[in-house]
Amino acid sequence: MNGRADFREPNAQVSRPIPDIGGGYIPTEEEWRLFAECHEECFWFRSVPLAATSMLITQGLISKGILSSHPKYGSIPKLLFACIVGYFAGKLSYVKTCQEKFKKLENSPLGEALRSGELRRSSPPGHYTQKPKFDSNVSGQSSFGTSPAADNIEKEALPRYEPIPFSASMNESTPTGITDHIAQGPEPNLEESPKRKGVTYEELRSKNRESYGVTLPHKTDPSVRPMQERVPKKEVKVNKYGDTWDE
């Protein structure tokens, strides 16, 4: 042990580092030879045939009147354009074949880069990602034995976990730490409820009459008026001095 704990999972697949191929990369002799071979084959087997075919097709379309020729230069501009298009189309079509040749080339950084890129595209995500190394290098050099100070730091950093009793997990009404319960009011006293008397409709009606009679002025029933009000008064005569007499 050298004071550093380095844990790795067994059978972990670690990808080989991809060679750095930038703008200043200098190809090897084998790569230069393969470049020249690809250029020659691309020119004779792809660019020339496609350029000639494009020019023949363009000339046939001009002869049939489908394409119009230039009034001064005739069909030369369109034939040149068809030749250029066919030439570059042939070069693009040979790129895949040239890449396959470089992949088969041994001891070639360029071929290794092409193979690694193809494997990364074809493999599922995370297949070639390196497994994290568990280095206990947080507080300087560490070994399998940890100090009490490091244990205290780890305990403070980690969140505290309070286990819930088994009986609480079986009870659905026990709160689980989430404040989603609904506050309930105080339960009614069950002992006082039987003591209350039931109020009938007649009692309520009589109480309403009493309260209504207090708020209104007292009115007497015409049938209970005194008898003297019902008896018509006798007509009396009054003299000029205010004296009255009956006839």
UniProtKB/Swiss-Prot annotation:
Does this UniProt record's set of keywords contain Phosphoprotein? Answer: yes
A UniProt-annotated Pfam family: OCIA
Subunit note? Interacts with OCIAD2. Interacts with STAT3.
What GO terms in the biological process aspect are recorded for it?
Answer: regulation of stem cell differentiation
Output compositional bias ranges, type Basic and acidic residues: 192-210, 218-230
Location of the region described as Disordered in the Swiss-Prot/TrEMBL record: 113-153, 167-230
Q: What is this protein called?
A: OCIA domain-containing protein 1
Further remarks about this protein from its record: 'Asrij' stands for 'blood' in Sanskrit as this protein is strongly expressed in blood vessels.
Gene (UniProt): Ociad1
Expressed, tissue-wise, as follows: Expressed at high levels in the brain and at lower levels in the heart, ovary, testis and kidney. Expression is strongest in embryonic stem cells and in the blood vessels.
| Annotated localization | Endosome
What keywords sit in the KW lines?
Endosome, Phosphoprotein
Q: Which family does it belong to?
A: Belongs to the OCIAD1 family.
Which residues are annotated as modified residue Phosphoserine in the UniProt record? 108, 116, 123, 193
Indicate the segments forming the OCIA domain, all copies.
1-112
Report disulfide bridges, numbered on this chain: none
Q: Which domain of life is it from?
A: Eukaryota
What organism is recorded for this protein?
A: Mus musculus (Mouse)
Higher taxonomy = Eukaryota, Metazoa, Chordata, Craniata, Vertebrata
Record remark on domains: The OCIA domain is necessary and sufficient for endosomal localization.
Task: Give the induction annotation.
Answer: Expression is down-regulated as differentiation proceeds in stem cells.
> What InterPro entries does the database record attribute to this sequence?
OCAD1/2, OCIA_dom
